Amino acid sequence: MKVRASVKRICRNCKVIKRNGVVRVICSSDPKHKQRQG
């Protein structure tokens, strides 16, 4: 999980979602692409 000020999709499988007011990126193909805004 990377914590970043600016979250962007890294690959085409990444999805940007908002969970409890926190913007997150989840990825089915590569778990290293997981990000959270913070």
Curated annotation (Swiss-Prot):
Origin: domain of life: Bacteria
Annotated keywords: Ribonucleoprotein, Ribosomal protein
Family, per entry: Belongs to the bacterial ribosomal protein bL36 family.
One Gene Ontology molecular-function label: structural constituent of ribosome
GO BP annotations listed: translation
Signal peptide: none
Protein name: Large ribosomal subunit protein bL36
